[in-house]
Amino acid sequence: YEIVTCYRNSKNFGDSWVSAGYGLWFLREAKYLNASRMLLGTSCAISGTGFMFSHRILEKRGGWHYFLLTEDIEFTADNIINGEKIGYSAKAVLYDEQPVKFSQSWRQRMRWTRGNMDVLRYYCRRLFRGMFKGSFSCYDMLMCICPGFFLFGFGVAANAVAIVENMTGHGSW
């Protein structure tokens, strides 16, 4: 792998329930998402500051062009679209200090939400195209960025079909 992410751990796990929550989230992300992706042979996702990449990746992209609020997700999406697979190293551990107050966490999560929306705006079309070209990694990335949008879209479409069927008399209700 020329791009590798690590196990991101909370430096201040015991300081508050908020920082403990972050630690549990990182554990979930590492063990149940990235480790599973490695077993399946699909691309992992970078989350936060604990990652590395080869100089070739930087040259191939023409430098560092990732400046959205969630540049880690942006970097992941762009590389997945371009066919790169991101690996995961469980032995590489980064200890990151996390918010201890709910208000700090809320502000951070609002930034991340905005960042994910920006990534979606810039990369959704290409991820969607990649998904239909057979890239499970593109599908996985879309589901990580915005699972609610796809579930909402599916729900709207299913209800629209049901309404039309019932209005035309083809529905069995």
Q: Residues of each region from the PLM?
A:
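Long helical/loop segments within the catalytic core of UDP-sugar-dependent glycosyltransferases
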Residues: 1-68, 110, 117-121
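Generic beta-strand/beta-sheet core signal
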Residues: 6-7, 89, 97, 144
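Basic/Trp-rich segment in TM-proximal cytosolic loops or flexible interdomain/linker regions
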Residues: 40-42, 100-173
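Catalytic donor-sugar/metal-binding loop of nucleotide-sugar-dependent glycosyltransferases
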Residues: 41, 67, 76-95
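Catalytic cores of eukaryotic secretory-pathway lumenal/extracellular enzymes that build
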Residues: 48, 88-89, 95-107
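Catalytic core and acceptor-binding pocket of nucleotide-sugar-dependent glycosyltransferases
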Residues: 50, 71-72, 141, 146
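Structural detector for helix-capping/boundary residues
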Residues: 55-56, 73, 92
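Short, hydrophobic alpha-helical packing/hinge segments within bilobed ligand-binding/sensory domains
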Residues: 75-76, 105
